[in-house]
Amino acid sequence: MNVIPAMLSLHLALPLIIAISIIFCSLTLLTNERKMYNAIEVALFGIAAIISFIMLWQSYSGIFLHILQANAFSELLFGSLAFGAMLVLLLTVNAKQQKEMRLLMSLVLFGIFMVSFAYSVLAIIIGLETVIIATVFMILSNGKRYIEPAMKLFILGAISTGLFVAALALLLPYNPSLSITTSLTQGAGRFIIGLSLVLFAAALAVETGAFPFNLWIPDVYDGSPGNITALMAGINKKVAFVAVLEIFIIMFSSYGMYGNGNLVSTVFFVLSIFTMFFGNLIALIQKNVKKMFAYSSISQAGYIFIGISAATKLGIEGSIFYIIAHMLMIIGAFSIVFWLESNNIKNIDEYGGLKDRNPFAAVALTILMLSMAGIPPLIGFAGKFILFSSAVYSNDILLAVIGIINSFISIYYYAKVINQMFQKRMSPRIQMPANIAAVVAICTILVIIIGIYPQILLGPSYLAAAYVI
Amino acid sequence: MIPLILLIIIPSAFFAAIAVFRRYGRILSTVSALAGLALILFIFGSSLISGSAAVISQSYSYIPSLGIQFTLSVSNISLVLLLMASIILLATSLSGNMGLEKETLSSLLIVLFQIGAYGLFISGNFFIFFIFWDIGVIAPFFMINVLGSANRRIASYKFILYELFSSALLLTAIILVYFYSPGHTLNIYSLAGLYSSMPIYIQETIFSLFFIAFMINMPLFPLHTWLPDAHSEASTQGSMMLSGILTKFGGFGMLLIFITMPIARSFSLYIAALATISAFYAAFLMMRQRDIKRIVAHTTIIEMSIIMFSIATMTAIGYEGALYGMLSHGLVVALMFLAAGGIEHMFHERNIGVLKGLSKYSKTTSYVFLIGIFVMSGLPLTTGFVSDLLIFIGGINAFGIYGIVPLFSLILLAGFMYLVINRSFFANKQPTKPSEHLPQAAKAGYAILLLSIFIFGILPFIVLNLVNSSIL
Amino acid sequence: MDILYLILPLLIGGAASLLLGINENGKRYSKYAAFAGALGSSILTLIALAYPAMLQYGQIAWFTASGSISFPLSFSFGYINQVLLILVGIISPLIFLYSIGYMDEPGEQGRYYVELSLFAASMILLAVSGGFITFFIAWEGLGITSYLLIGFWMQKDAPPYAARKAITTIVIGDIMMLSGILLIWASLNTFNFAAIISAIGAMAAVPISIIVALALIIFGAFTKSAQFPFHEWLSDAMEGPTPVSAFLHSSTMVKAGVFVVIILLPIITHANLLWVLLVFGIITSIVGAFNASGSTHLKKILAYSTIEDLGLMFVALGLNAVSAAVAFFIVQAIYKALLFMNAGSIMKANNDEVDIYQVSSFSRNRLLFAVGIIGAISLAGIFPASGFFGKLLIDSAASSNATVYIILTVLDFVTGFYIFRWLFIPIGHIGKNGSAAIRAKYSALSKAMLVPQVILAAIALLLTILFLYALTSVSIQAAVILTAASLFGILSAYLLFRTSPNNLWERSRSREFLSKGFFVNKAYAYIASGIAAIAIGIESIDGAINRLVYVGAEGILRIGNSMRRTGNGIVNTYVAALAIGLVLLIAILVFVI
């Protein structure tokens, strides 16, 4: 298989594909709407993902321009997130504002690329910013109704960026190259570096949705159209997690232990506990499915923090695994929510009898929710097992126990929806459009397959984790 | 030795087949149960002939980064439970989904549960154990939630919350075992000698977590409240599987931890006391029930408490008694739920205050129910007698004269059951008229279960000779 | 011949009659199949008794548990086994024959005969059991068949209730018996009677666990042998068909308890538990005799009389007079079966009327009357009926104990009184349906019902010869006292019921009191409601546990509810929370560094 790299030098292939995608989408803005363009765009996303996976397979690594670097970590996460972005794009192919969506999605792809392949902190901020701005415009493109969530997202994104830049400014004297591989040690200015760490944490906590920085999330998720919610929960948040891993695990890795413990671990320990409980407890009483999933995705972020808090290879492996796992689960779930929303079905009560109205959707949503609740043999269980194990491994039994308690609490609200869906109601059947069905099917099948044989994803996650820590 | 993974692959294949050929759901699930039974009989027969006492394990690579393998093991305990499970599954699939249209779904869930039950009983490490444990919980959840009767929603909710709480504890315990065992092993059988190298407080924590998890599943007082609702609201097939097989998950786990964990000895006396209380408590509670399925559900608590008591004796004969008790109880409770389901189907009524003189129009079912009571009260030449003998010999060996106390809860059980049957079944003055006939298929279910009860009751050495060599 | 072959014909006959009973055409032959089975078993039994050398018995390995603990089926053929076998062998075919006449509705015959055959098979198994496992199998078989047969007439009001009472008592007894068996096993590691007796006999002091075990076995035996306070089920058991009463509830099944106590008597003596037998035997026989005097139910009088007889057997055992007990064991079975068959014939002729004041006399059928009198004098203990010797032996055994002797003599009087009350009251009574119809019915009584009675009456008399031949010395004084007491009883009955026009006894307060059965049933009811009260209490505890879980869940939901306000849609809140979070993080920083 040396043919492919020979044909197309891989490190150029990805930027090329993204550039083509952006140019192509810009051009299609000028022409009439054609279904084929959507197909081409989806294909481009798919090719990007595939190239990334091939790079992973070929163990390709390298550094470019002191801004980007390629390694197993970046390749795995870019490939997976690009794949997720492709799924989200697939959701929107029939939307009326598809032209704008295409362009904005290709910008999102660019953002994912920048963050995943970041070598410099600058690449991370550029990537994050691109993703947020693109998302804001995506929401806005749906009409006047959506100005409010777009503005909220924009404001919070701006604050996040501000905090990020402030952290960067504090860091500059100690890390003039802004490279994430520079190890920051506890020499002079350790308090300044610590402050910078905290500001980074706050900035990324806003975007990853850690409590108490996450109050905007349910509001914006609920206010936005379902497909963009899927994007925000499935891609934006995960991109922020990639940034978290890069900054805290790579850059601050040797910022070492202090009197009462590792600062990174402590910060994420606290954030993890708060976030899990916050998301789950409020999700318990939600009547609106979309909001419920919004809160649920908050609590799921808390699980990812467990692995980061453990800051061991196993923990990072688990976090990477769970980032991808949750992306699949939440995109699948929000796709169904998105579709039902367009049929004016929003509340849990209205989900009653979904099994008879569209068995496929009911079964898929059930599987996805069971996976989120951590029921084996689904992907969520494999991820949680590794995360909780990593917590125990680094002697944080408390964190593991809280994680397990939270997965138990989450059963309550997932079961509520399942309970409703399988009730008998005399309602007409509703048809699911083929593109949404495809997204749901892909997510569900992957959730089951990787769940039954987690090694498919665990192997690459392990490789990726080896680069990070 | 045939690959044990066949026991999982075959039902999985049938699961897929039912999903495709929806019209043949019941036939396919029956064939699946038959195939499973044939395989298990083959393994059973070959172990009986070879008389090998060793646990047979087969491993496949699963999660190398954690050092977790997909290990399947067959011990003597699991063989007996597998045999029981396949007989019940066969009877369950064969007797069909009386009066309900959703037969495909029902068959699918039975086969899914078959995967869970087989997988659990042949799991060689706790990771696999946990996976199949939860599969075994999800299938009955839908059996209650979708196919159940009037109060199914609350019942299924309670069921899933309790069961998954139990599995949360189980998960915690498993993770602890993983990190404290030398060499990070989760292998159920090879852990036997390794627990003692862990710190005492960790052993105690692990044991308590396992114990409470299994205790919820079995169930024991005071964590039993989910059971009467769940078992009585499930569809007939669901009740048969729940009471017959699912409660044995906990029993199986209890046997494993008591046999392998030396720390159990410091708890066994308290656990035996708890089990005794639980048996009497449930017996008294049963007397307040008027719903025939709830009554049968309460007998499950009583019998499982006695089985727990037997395990807590920590004697070889006590373990055998518990195993035989599970075999006996699984078969008989499935029989009784099938009979109760038949009554519900025929008379559209479950309240024993309303039902009168059932034996007039449903002789078979009435006598089947009666035989069920006989077995539960320990009639010789049925499995009930053998298990009572073994259990209480174990009890006396371990606790002296107090070891006989739980036996007296059977007076309450039998006394009340006879009251029920004589009021509602065998008092024919003003018999209730049935609105439907009992399907012939249900009679086939009766026949299979009765036959097994008598075979294992009259020829107990079939099972005991296997177990005699080694309980594991 | 293996000893188990003795029950084979019965099992085959029972199965055949069940199968025939299901078949429309075969229904009529059901009874004959069962009778043939019983007769076959009986013949085999008699052959076995005649040529004991032919028999093979001993231990059959049944199963082994835990590697070494074996559960064998043991059989034995000692004298007590033979006695019980003879009784069953004689009575069982007679009962089947009687049933052919008595059970004349064909619809339910299959069920009846299979239950009866199973019962007879269990009885034979019990008789030949040589160890507790075999014994307990038979014991449970007796209990269950008895339960089924008592409740045989499901379409009536009372039988299901009576069956429930019987089975409840029987279950209590079964559990006590099983507990005792297991406790004995735990001490001695054997189930074999002979081994147990020799092992305990060799002990200097009997350990407490064996005493408890023996007590449990004795009380288990009391439940089946209807001893106070477990005796009330037997009077209710009269709701079953009469052949059942004649077979199970007077002559055979109720002897199971006596049988096991006789077997274990050496160790009961060794464990100093004879007083239990004596005390409960005396109480039971008093209760039984007086209840019999109070009742007006044709069969219940006999049932209470059976209770009294069983009590007397336990008295004899309590006095360690095994031979007296065994002698009474035999004669009682014969005359009680006879009397029940007699009562059944009366009922049959009177359309199942059971009140002795309503039935018309059986003096119209002279044969019936004659065998009835033989039964009655045998029960009363008048020479030349064999009952006389049974009572005489027990009385002689008690002669060393003045209190017991006096009580027994009073009971002799009461026995004579109530059985002749039973006999006299219906005499000359016209009955509701007019005499002509009744007379026709009496003369139409099936031969199958009369023949067994004649045979039994003959046996009751012939046994006398046997006793005269076998007994070497009898206490003349005791014989005189017994005869006097009984005759006095009969005389009182004659005076009260044959000569006096206004019936003093029947309207007296004491009879009314006695007919209430010493409030034992009321005590049962109190116990039952006590258990029900506990059940209510437990139920409320259960409710509390449930509520506790709900309250916990509610609490968690409430926390969630109160936190929901954070997502109020106002950006200011979000930014404020963010600021707080930042402060929190800085606090962590300060704390950690």
Where are these regions (language model features)?
Chain B
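Short phosphate-coordinating micro-motif centered on Lys-Gly-acidic
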Residues: 134
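Transmembrane helix-loop-helix hairpins at membrane boundaries of multipass inner-membrane proteins
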Residues: 1-6, 13-108, 189, 468
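Hydrophobic alpha-helical membrane-insertion segments
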Residues: 31-47, 163-174, 449-458
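Alpha-helical transmembrane segments
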Residues: 8, 12, 30-40, 86-87, ...
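Aromatic-anchored segments of alpha-helical transmembrane domains
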Residues: 38-41, 114-118, 307, 455
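Alpha-helical transmembrane segments and their helix-start/interface "positive-inside/aromatic belt" motifs
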Residues: 23-35, 154-164, 362-366, 442-447
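Cytoplasmic/organellar membrane-interface segments at the starts of transmembrane helices
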Residues: 362-364, 417-472
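Hydrophobic transmembrane alpha-helices and their helix-loop junctions in integral membrane proteins
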Residues: 93-97, 115-127, 140-389, 393-423, ...
